[in-house]
Amino acid sequence: MEGMTQRLEAMLAKGTDNMLLRFSLGKAYAEQDCFREAETHLRAALAFDPAYSVAWKWLGKACLGQGDKAGARAAWESGLQAAQARGDQQVVKELQVFIKRLDKEAAAGG
């Protein structure tokens, strides 16, 4: 996976900058538990397309990975709105589950 992030970072350094590149970098960094880097690239991806619900999903994971539950909730709620607007039912279901987990943790005092 690190080889992929290096290749993607090289593309970015050469001047390529678009939603798919930033999303791919953000997702790859999140999968490596490099959440701060993931957040940076996912926010950049969303600047290109704020309706891209999957980027919101991964941004929430990156925020949660940094201990930012409020940021995760905000990202997932934005993603939920985007997914509902696009009719992306799978992402809607996933985000509803993530939000419910946060609610359960909050109710349990976590």
Can you describe what each PLM-predicted range is?
Residues 11, 44-45, 79:
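Canonical positions in the second alpha-helix
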Residues 14, 48, 65, 82-86:
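Structural marker of alpha-solenoid helical repeat scaffolds
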